[in-house]
Regions:
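Alpha-helix C-terminal capping/helix-coil junction sites
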Residues: 42, 112, 142, 194-195
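Short, surface-exposed polybasic/aromatic micro-patch for ligand or macromolecular engagement
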Residues: 1-52, 239
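Short, flexible, glycine-rich and Lys/Arg-enriched loop motifs at helix boundaries
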Residues: 223-241
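Basic, Lys/Arg- and aromatic-enriched nucleic-acid-binding interface segment
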Residues: 120-132, 143-209, 215, 226, ...
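Short, Lys/Arg-enriched alpha-helical recognition elements, typified by the DNA-recognition helix
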Residues: 34, 49-142, 154-157, 172-173, ...
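Catalytic-site neighborhood detector that most strongly recognizes the C-terminal catalytic loop/helix
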Residues: 27, 159, 225-227, 338-357
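Short, basic (Lys/Arg/His-rich) helix/loop patches that form interaction surfaces
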Residues: 116-120, 174-188, 197, 246, ...
């Protein structure tokens, strides 16, 4: 078993080589590190000949070794589901060095027609998630010298049609709030805040009183709750745009003051003492964090009891954004308030429906 580090002709890249000629391209320092890793793998008996690695073996190792340390638990969980249910049954036994772009193109076609577990078509959006997962994974396979190039980079995912978003009319908002006020005080206040701020479900669940200044009427988004099989996790926004401050309407502040008083009365009645700034604004009944999935279930039940069309919780965010744009608020301000990475995203979501209205 031989090994060497060398610089290629007319190239500033260095290569670490180990028989059978596995190559890694990068700086000299990176090549030295990779060579040490390869030699350690050989000594431990963990070295796998790249020519014998199947797609399933690589993706399993990539998910456990790379994804586990470089993406959020929720994203890793999603990657594992897509790999297990949508990729491995079709391509798992193929040698990764035999994989070509045409195989991925055929895979996407099969998933669109019958890609669901148990049968049925997958949506173009979900197939797009599969594509992004594979593009990232096979990009690393190419970087690590297992394949010559990333086949997913040569394939276009299926086009996702623009879906119609839910925007509530004023009479629908009024009817919904009137019913919630008498039926469920917590959901009523959540609806008021969502309609006045555009916060996402996870951001509402993670909101603390320390994030709200009732005197200056400001709210600061600092965290979100992520729900995985392992439990709940408070996490910072994915990008700097998600970390944001906004001014709330006086009507929202008024309801939050009433909610603060009611929450403290409940705590005192239970012998828990007065609340603190670190308390959650919208906790569960036992004053533990409210799970996002639980909130969605409770919301669906409450809306179903009202009657009329089913209104999703996320529709309140859409309604908030569309009302701002309709009132003449510039798109950059709306985008920042929603925590979008760019105004282009905001226009892509809300431009078409506003033209129709």
């Amino acid at each position: 078993m031989g090994a060497e580090i060398r610089s290629g002709h007319r190239s500033r890249h260095w290569q670490a080589r180990i028989t059978k000629y596995q190559s890694f391209k990068g700086t000299k320092r990176e090549a030295q590190i990779e060579l040490v890793r390869l030699m350690d793998a050989v000594r431990r008996g963990d070295y796998i000949d790249p020519s014998k690695v199947t797609v399933a073996e690589f993706l399993d190792r990539w998910e456990k070794d790379w994804a586990a340390n470089n993406v959020s638990p929720k994203t890793r969980e999603r990657f594992a589901q897509l790999i297990t249910h949508q990729v491995q049954p079709h391509l798992g036994n193929m040698l990764i060095q035999k994989l070509r772009a045409v195989h991925l193109s055929e895979l996407y076609g099969r998933l669109l027609s019958n890609g669901r577990v148990g049968g049925g078509a997958l949506s173009a959006k979900t197939v797009g998630h599969v594509h992004r997962c594979l593009r990232r994974a096979f990009g690393h396979a190419a970087q690590w010298g297992l394949i010559a190039q990333n086949p997913a980079a040569l394939v276009h995912p299926p086009r996702v049609r623009q879906t119609e978003i839910e925007i509530l009319r004023q009479n629908e908002v009024e009817a919904m709030l009137a019913s919630l006020r008498s039926r469920n005080a917590l959901l009523f206040t959540i609806a008021i805040v969502a309609l006045g701020s555009g916060l996402r479900r996870g951001e509402l669940c993670a909101l603390r009183w320390s994030n709200i200044d009732l005197e200056s009427r400001t709210l600061r988004v600092e965290q979100s709750i992520e729900q995985t099989r392992a439990g709940l996790r408070f996490k910072a926004p994915k990008t700097k745009h998600g970390l944001r401050s906004m001014t709330l309407p006086p009507s929202v502040i008024s309801e939050l003051r009433a909610h603060w008083r009611a929450q403290n009365e409940q705590r005192l009645a239970l012998g828990l003492g007065r609340g603190s700034p670190d308390d959650l604004v919208f906790p569960a009944w036992d004053h533990q964090p409210l799970m996002p999935n639980t909130l969605s279930r409770e919301w669906s039940r409450a809306v179903a009891a009202i009657g009329g069309r089913r209104i999703s919780l996320h529709a309140l965010r859409h309604t908030h954004a569309s009302s701002l744009i309709a009132a003449g608020v510039d798109i950059l301000t709306v985008s920042r308030r929603l925590g979008h990475a760019s105004p282009t995203i905001t226009l892509g979501v809300y431009g078409p429906p506003l033209r129709e209205h």
